[in-house]
Amino acid sequence: MSIKGKELAGGNVSLSGKISSQFISGLLIPSPYTKKSVTVNIKDYIVQHSYVLLTLQLMEKFGANVEYDNNLKKIVVHPSHYTPQDIELEADASTACYFLALAALTNGKIRIDNLTYETKQPDIKMVDVLEQMGCKVTKGSSFIELEGVSQLKGGFEISMREMSDQTLTLAAIAPFADRGITIKDVEHIRHHESDRISVICESLTQLGIRVEEFKDGLKVFPGNPKPTLLNTHDDHRVAMSLALIGSKVEGIQINDPGCVSKTCPQYFRLLESLGLNISHL
């Protein structure tokens, strides 16, 4: 496919937000450079509302002229220009959650610097889930620290819509909780890099874990995963989540681990640095 750039006209567009917020952010970012204002109407709902809000706030910081309200049903971007700014980037909360979950799972302790609970990244709310499961969390002015427990607590139902990238993380540690955990409101992740609901249910079943699959989520029951070979389906979040199980069960093998390069190329080396025994075949 070849695309030849030309001046953007602007105008009105109607867009769905129920599959991914990324389509909306991708449309908004170039909109200040259109000839006339761009009006984006969301015809249903946004599954990860906070990411669009984060996009808009950064656009404003760099000089864009935008109008929106908190429900983000209508967003207007007026012709304007970005101006250079110096900013300090914080750590990626989505990636940090795998390491927080690792500490939770192994009764360990970890501190993530350059990330606070006050971040606007929605996946930071995974900290609340881990706290609900019994972990001790310290919310510092420049860090998050988590200390695990010997037995994780389950027995709850949770909507993961706003932090849906952590659905697989929670599903991977759920077998080690004392009671079942139900995850809901994440039907949209069936349309991400893989059908993530189907894939994690398939993987947990291969591990010998009882799981119930729903249209918009799943329920994971406590169990003792057995060693097996698991397929990542070329999905970085599948690989990163399933690797956590290997911290508790010897003999977990993962096909195509290189798919983590999309998010965290050094993921397995970082796990090794934290004490996990990883063999690269």
Residues of each region from the PLM?
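Short, structured segments at the rim of ligand-binding sites
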Residues: M1-L281
